Amino acid sequence: FQGPLNFSFDPAVLSAYIAELKQLEPTVTPTLATFYHLVQLSARKEAFINELPMETINPLYKTILGEFSVKRWLAADAAQVEWNEEEAAYLLEIVKALDEQGIKLLVGSDAGTMYMPPGSSTHDEMTLMIRAGLTTRTVLAAATINAAETLGVADRYGSIEVGKVADLVLTAGNPLDDLQTLRRPLGVVKTGQWISEEQLEALRESGRHPSNFYISLGRLLEDLLRRALQ
């Protein structure tokens, strides 16, 4: 939107660019969730932050994000909020147009930006792709087989087939009917190893206790020093 379309909301400009883009046979990762996050920060401010699983974010990283990215959007005025909301709505239209023209899409949330937690932000991304008008089958393909094909590992990953690595999720409902069932799986098979619902909850609980600020700062400084001496 910012680049090729030069902030234009003109459908004709979008159509012409997608026609040109299609000649390249590209793969596109929309990252709708990160802009949605930006919109919510600018519009709802602290009320939105209070709804986020902030306990899962490393405290050092949280401080850095707050200073260098979040603060800007918390200070957004009404005019900026209106622009953000208009752009967010048009981003959905762009994704729908890309899909209609047969552009291969991937699921990627850009987790880690602006207090976006990994994991749940991927589900948010898929929800937004549905909101854009894509089918659940298209979104699931974008999260699985499309990604495997793009990375060149579709012979081993991306679908449930004989001979492929056993990576799959067991859900209470059919994701083709409702993607939200993926948010609380009954179990996961990772490289053939069964991870039960209880074990998944234990992993979630562990994620709520990241390393503390000073240990993280020490590790960061150690890494920077190591890089400087290379």
List each language-model region with its residue ranges.
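Active-site neighborhoods of metal-dependent hydrolases
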Residues: 1-132, 223-230
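Active-site microenvironment of metallo-dependent hydrolases
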Residues: 100, 127, 137-230
